[in-house]
């Protein structure tokens, strides 16, 4: 049986993985179009994790991301990379490293003093902000469909309604928000989708950080009893 050029599958935490078995953008485009026409209701503004395959070493990942966005498919990160070359390709493209499937290495914090990127406004839908080698501070909301990421910490002095990633590229970081109702969160390669966020922390001010192979949540304000 011939292997599908484009395949979607669900993974842990209800995540959706996109696997590509071609290095030709034109072939991928045709396959995506065919796949979406077969189930149009499923592929409406979905966020996916791109599973790295050998074919992708020959693909311009930025062009691939733009191609997917033409079909309202948003790549939020890349998993299953296996070597330094693949890691560099992903980092150069501006996509987040979300680790290798089922493999997590212990991340130990190191003393550091990162610069800070500050945004003094709301982050609108479809807007992407990435703070490379720095922390990110947002004085406003991260709207649905927006994406913010930082190699360090992400501080949101407003509502987190879109997607946020801290500790990108296997760094240490935390997400701080005054109101959690995110579409997707990731810290140091650990991630959760909206449907799997702990109910008790939703619509609350929280800190989110990685602890071994899980995401941990702490209230920023003491709960009234």
Curated annotation (Swiss-Prot):
Keyword Cell division listed: yes
Highest taxon above the source species: Bacteria
Gene Ontology process terms (BP): cell morphogenesis; division septum assembly; regulation of cell division; regulation of cell septum assembly
Keyword match Transmembrane helix: no
Keywords, alphabetical: Cell cycle, Cell division, Septation
Pfam families: MinC_C (PF03775), MinC_N (PF05209)
InterPro entries, sorted: CAP/MinC_C, MinC, MinC_C_sf, MinC_N, Septum_form_inhib_MinC_C
Subunit structure: Interacts with MinD and FtsZ.
HAMAP family (UniProt xref): MinC (MF_00267)
Function: Cell division inhibitor that blocks the formation of polar Z ring septums. Rapidly oscillates between the poles of the cell to destabilize FtsZ filaments that have formed before they mature into polar Z rings. Prevents FtsZ polymerization.
PANTHER family: SEPTUM SITE-DETERMINING PROTEIN MINC (PTHR34108:SF1)
Family as reported in the entry's similarity comment: Belongs to the MinC family.
Protein name: Probable septum site-determining protein MinC
Organism of derivation: Pasteurella multocida (strain Pm70)
Protein encoded by which gene: minC
């Amino acid at each position: 049986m011939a292997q599908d050029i484009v395949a979607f599958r669900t993974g842990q935490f209800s995540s959706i993985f996109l696997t590509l078995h071609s290095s030709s953008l034109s072939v991928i485009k045709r396959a995506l179009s065919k796949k979406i026409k077969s189930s149009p209701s499923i592929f409406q503004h979905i966020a996916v994790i791109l599973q790295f395959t050998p074919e992708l070493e020959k693909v311009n990942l930025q062009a691939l991301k733009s191609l997917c966005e033409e079909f309202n498919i948003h790549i939020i990160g890349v998993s299953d990379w296996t070597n330094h070359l693949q890691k560099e390709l992903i980092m150069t493209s501006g996509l987040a490293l979300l680790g290798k499937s089922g493999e997590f290495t212990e991340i130990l914090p190191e003393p550091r003093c990162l610069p800070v990127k500050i945004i003094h406004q709301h982050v609108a839908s479809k807007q992407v902000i990435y703070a490379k080698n720095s922390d990110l501070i947002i004085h406003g909301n991260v709207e649905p469909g927006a994406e913010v990421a930082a190699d360090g910490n992400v501080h949101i002095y407003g509502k987190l309604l879109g997607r946020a990633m801290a500790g990108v590229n296997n760094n240490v970081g935390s997400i701080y928000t005054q109101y959690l109702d995110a579409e997707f969160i990731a810290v140091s390669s650990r991630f959760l989708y909206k449907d799997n966020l702990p109910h008790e922390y939703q619509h609350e001010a929280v800190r989110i950080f990685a602890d071994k192979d899980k995401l941990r949540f702490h209230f920023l304000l003491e709960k009234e009893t």
